[in-house]
Amino acid sequence: MALIRKTFYFLFAVFFILVQLPSGCQAGLDFSQPFPSGEFAVCESCKLGRGKCRKECLENEKPDGNCRLNFLCCRQRI
């Protein structure tokens, strides 16, 4: 009985530790160095995939909402 309980607690602790590890997107990729084209490496799109999260929109894009703290959702101008 005690062995089953200890095993359960051990597995629960391992699961809790694994859940706390950040994924690739949350591990700092949002704030990585810009690509040669000037775009920042962001991990998500916005507006159902019709926009990109950027710090500044390009000339042919317009801001269409916010993604995160200092990021704008930029969509192509029509």
UniProtKB/Swiss-Prot annotation:
It comes from Gorilla gorilla gorilla. It is found in: Secreted. Residues 1-27 form the signal peptide. Its main location: secreted. InterPro entries: Beta_defensin_dom (IPR025933). One of its GO terms (cellular component) is extracellular region. It comes from the Eukaryota. This is Beta-defensin 105A. The keyword Calcium does not apply. Belongs to the beta-defensin family. The keyword Signal applies. Has antimicrobial activity. Keywords: Antibiotic, Antimicrobial, Defensin, Disulfide bond, Secreted, Signal. GO terms for biological process: defense response to bacterium; innate immune response. Disulfide bonds join C43-C74, C53-C67, C57-C73.
